Amino acid sequence: MEYTGSEYKGERLHGRLEGKGEYILPTETRYEGEMKDGMFHGQGTLFFPNGSKYVALWDHGIALQGKYTFADGLEYDKEDWRYCDQYDRRFYTEICDGLKPAGRSQLTDLDPPRKIPDGCYDCGDGFYNPLTRVVNDYQHKFLRNADDDEHEWIIQKCRKGWDETTGYRPKQSQSTKT
């Protein structure tokens, strides 16, 4: 663990992580639960630095079933995910606390929203710099490098740190396209 920057407190068997324990990754994500032969095995929970958590049943490091809960208490539902979709654009705090009056609309679930550094995007767990393709957490510590799919998703879907004036864009018909 000294090589990875991880930390483990818990039971061992023949020098291997085995039984109940707490495993802390260098990103400060923490696993509490059962281990077998050095892997998550049995009931266990991942606690993320942003306050969210994933409670799961693990089999040799693979989550067989689990439930993700965001820091604000919203639970992810894989089958019927209706949060902030085309039918209901409210953030979870607006669902719980009601909408704000006109002129004070929320830009994010967090109100007031975080200030995004110039040239970056807020991707939900940190700020993304498209030039370096690096995601840093909100305290500006490295989280990960974005692959091509995540890069495209962030560019298309996430809030950016600058304003763009787009103006009216009439829908072009097929005959007027060049």
Curated annotation (Swiss-Prot):
It comes from the Eukaryota. GO terms for cellular component: sperm flagellum. The keyword Nucleotide-binding does not apply. MORN repeats lie at residues 8-30, 31-53, 54-75. Keywords: Cell projection, Cilium, Flagellum, Repeat. The keyword Repeat applies. SMART domains: MORN (SM00698). It holds the Pfam family MORN. It is found in: Cell projection, Cilium, Flagellum. Gene3D superfamilies: Histone H3 K4-specific methyltransferase SET7/9 N-terminal domain. InterPro entries: MORN, Morn5. PANTHER family: MORN REPEAT-CONTAINING PROTEIN 5. This is MORN repeat-containing protein 5. It comes from Xenopus tropicalis (Western clawed frog).
